[in-house]
UniProtKB/Swiss-Prot annotation:
Belongs to the adenylate kinase family. The lineage of its organism: Bacteria, Pseudomonadati, Chlorobiota, Chlorobiia, Chlorobiales. This is Adenylate kinase. The keyword Cytoplasm applies. GO terms for molecular function: adenylate kinase activity; ATP binding. One of its GO terms (biological process) is AMP salvage. Its EC number is 2.7.4.3.
Length: 218
């Protein structure tokens, strides 16, 4: 089984990707991890990708596809894979089909933007320990202070409302065409078209996980 998992920042994709991979015995492939590992191992493609990333540029689809094909050839991927954060563009999706890497399911964890802004902009952290709080869902005993040390909590720059909204705009611009691409493949009855599942991402971790499992097992 090969699954693509989509979800906006703050939609809970990271939590659910682990559960899906464990439940179905899949190897999780994250392009970010894959690029970092290839560079760390000193592979030519990895070093080339690192040079591009260090220059602040986007790694080409050709390099990413070559690394993905290499990953898929490994024994640990023989039982199936979960693509986390890939594809990001129509070009990458078409490259998968051109390489005859057939996807069985595309799962999008959907959460409204207002809810994501509320989730992410409410996060507060104690930098020294990494302890995390939320002003609404998991507040500290004393507002703005770490429970254990009494030291001030901070909001990371990535979690500011303005930054979260910008990240959501980028996500929607990338993902909307992908969703349309995969739903059209399914509607046209194209050969090896994956099934697309839009999963409501509001609820407990267990509720959302069960919705995903039910969709994939139906």
């Amino acid at each position: 089984m090969k699954i693509i998992l989509l979800g906006a920042p703050g939609a809970g994709k990271g939590t659910q990707s682990t559960s899906i991979a464990e439940h179905f015995g899949l190897q999780r492939i994250s392009t970010g991890d894959m690029l970092r590992n290839a560079a760390k191992e000193g592979k030519p493609l990895g070093l080339e990708a690192k040079k591009i990333m260090d220059a602040g540029q986007l790694v080409s689809d050709d390099i990413i596809m070559a690394l993905i094909k290499e990953c898929l050839s490994k024994d640990e991927c023989s039982c199936g894979v979960l693509f986390d954060g890939f594809p990001r563009t129509i070009g990458q999706a078409e490259a998968l089909r051109a390489e005859e890497i057939h996807i069985d399911h595309v799962v999008e964890i959907y959460v409204q933007d207002e809810e994501i802004v509320k989730r992410m902009s409410g996060r507060r952290v104690h930098l020294a320990s990494g302890r995390s709080y939320h002003v609404m869902f998991n507040p500290p005993k004393q507002e703005g202070l770490d429970d254990a040390t009494g030291e001030p909590l901070v909001q990371r720059a990535d979690d500011s409302e303005e930054t979260v909204k910008k990240r959501l705009q980028i996500y929607h611009a990338q993902t909307a065409p992908l969703v349309e691409y995969y739903t059209m493949l399914e509607q046209k009855g194209e050969s090896n078209a994956p099934r697309y599942h839009k999963i409501e991402g509001v609820g407990t971790v267990e509720e959302i996980r069960n919705r995903i499992f039910a969709a994939l097992e139906s």
